[in-house]
């Protein structure tokens, strides 16, 4: 049997948990500008499947790529790295 391709794993911050079983995670990366060589900060938002509604806004989470779960969801929650501090 052929080996399955490795799935992408990202770490990011939960920016929204208002949907049922879905969270929005913002993943930030740093890339070099091709001409000027300056380090630029980029961020991208992903819809992530959260089966038990455990993640809350502000948490740092790890997400993994998976099969399409809906029109926009292609990631699932692996674990919560750090809980948000409630003030």
UniProtKB/Swiss-Prot annotation:
Keyword rRNA-binding: yes
Cellular component, GO, one term: cytosolic small ribosomal subunit
UniProt entry keywords in alphabetical sequence: Ribonucleoprotein, Ribosomal protein, RNA-binding, rRNA-binding
Matching CDD domains: Ribosomal_uS17
Assembly: Part of the 30S ribosomal subunit.
Its job: One of the primary rRNA binding proteins, it binds specifically to the 5'-end of 16S ribosomal RNA.
The family this protein is said to belong to: Belongs to the universal ribosomal protein uS17 family.
Protein name per Swiss-Prot or TrEMBL: Small ribosomal subunit protein uS17
Organism this protein belongs to: Lacticaseibacillus paracasei (strain ATCC 334 / BCRC 17002 / CCUG 31169 / CIP 107868 / KCTC 3260 / NRRL B-441)
